[in-house]
Amino acid sequence: MTKKAIVWIREDFRVENNEALAYASQTHELVSALYIYNPKNFDKKREAQKWWLSRSLENFSLDLKKFNISLEIQSGDELDILKNIKKEDDVSIYWSKIYEPDIINKGKKIRDLFIQNDIKYKYFKGNILVEFQEMTKDDGTPYKVFTPFWRKTEQFYISKSPTKNLKIKSKEKMINFFKKSISPKELLPKKNWYKKFEKYWNPSEDNAKKYLQELIKSKIENYGETRDIPGVSGTSKLSPFLKFGQIHVETIWKKCQDIKVKQVGYRKYINELGWREFSHSLINYFPQMLKGNLRKDFDNFPWVKNEKFLE
């Protein structure tokens, strides 16, 4: 076992229910968290994501400091940054999986790099209830229909969900593996349009928990109706927090199970979590969905051009 560990953070900006971070803190004397900002992943269409990322890094860094764990931020291609880690550094690398085809393919190259350089590594289940590889039909083929997929997935998760010790162990001192680290503020969009945005959102783990409590307390009962009314704050507001991993889907699912009287809205919301699981399965078994239709007969779907229908 190496003395030092690096936890490679990608979409898991949380200390609660973070298996990679918990494992590293429990088994290594010195721990550092690493985020790699790849500019290629953030074009002009993703300016809002850059703002959320910047604020997430700031808040997550503060959360980690409570455990004497530093957050280091590097800019560049993931492979180029991780090449700097050598065997003589005597460090182990840990991370959580992301279930997107392109990221999975890049992950294979990174694992090959670590094997080639004799770097110890370990990865853990990501922000999902059940990994898509475990959910197939009895004949081994993937599901294309939601209802049977989610019925089987939910039953499987309930029966197999293990209880793990995911507490973060505080370190005696902080370390920095890299000589220099960029500031989260350097990732902010150049134009400060986000000033108004900040009146409505604060990307942090604590706020994710707050929105979950609001959902359970006052929204989920009527979720099936109010989520579709623009003038009513009827949605959970948890989507961006899930995207950046400031809350784990398991945390949401388990909190929902604590509801004593489960109304129709409860099932509606739980099914939304199911659609998230289903989407992970579909894009991996049918990656053509990322650029086209799952069913080819919809490629030339006839559109009716009639302005009266829009009145």
Q: Each PLM stretch: what is its role?
A:
Residues 1-160, 265:
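Trp/Phe/Arg-rich N-terminal binding region typifying the photolyase-homology
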